[in-house]
Amino acid sequence: MRYISGHVKKGRKTYYYVKDTQTGSFEKSCTKYLKHKILQNRSLNTVNRIAYTLPYYMNFLSERELTMMDVANMKFTDQSEHFYDFLMYVKNGIHTGTYREVKNNTANSYLQAVFGLYNFLHRCGELPYLNVLDDRNFSYVSPVGTNVSSTYTAYDGYLRSNEHQSRVATKEDIELILSACQNNRDRLLISLMEETG
């Protein structure tokens, strides 16, 4: 792997970076984006997840001998194919070298982090806007009668989301859980959840 992520502490803040192992230097665009996320007071878990994801994309670009500017300047169909290829790269586990398939939701979240980087670089004036991203408006009337509208960015090429596999707890399951409870508060909370469904 050519690109890796890491972190350093400066006082009470933790800063994340993406490093090129061939040159030993920081990957400036990714590191600048991660610093921006820290300065926006995003949670450390969020920034850590993004820092964990970006090297996979940078390695993907490196293997294809592309730069982010090359991708941003592609035509719509080429960009669509590029990001679909990245989704498959992650989905099939090629990004880690284990070739173990990951869930669609995981692959989609990795691509969302990449789009966040492209959006940040566009706002900084370093890259043009991606052709595959679509700005959409959403509006509704609030309960007090005012019109509320917002704009969001959409991408139509995400993989289908995985359905959550859940099962209903039986009476025996609940009794088993209640018998394992150490205190009355937990018993009460579980009983209330059972009553309310």
Model-derived features: where do they sit?
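Flexible interdomain linker/hinge and immediately adjacent N-terminus
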Residues: 127-171
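Basic, Lys/Arg- and aromatic-enriched nucleic-acid-binding interface segment
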Residues: 167-196
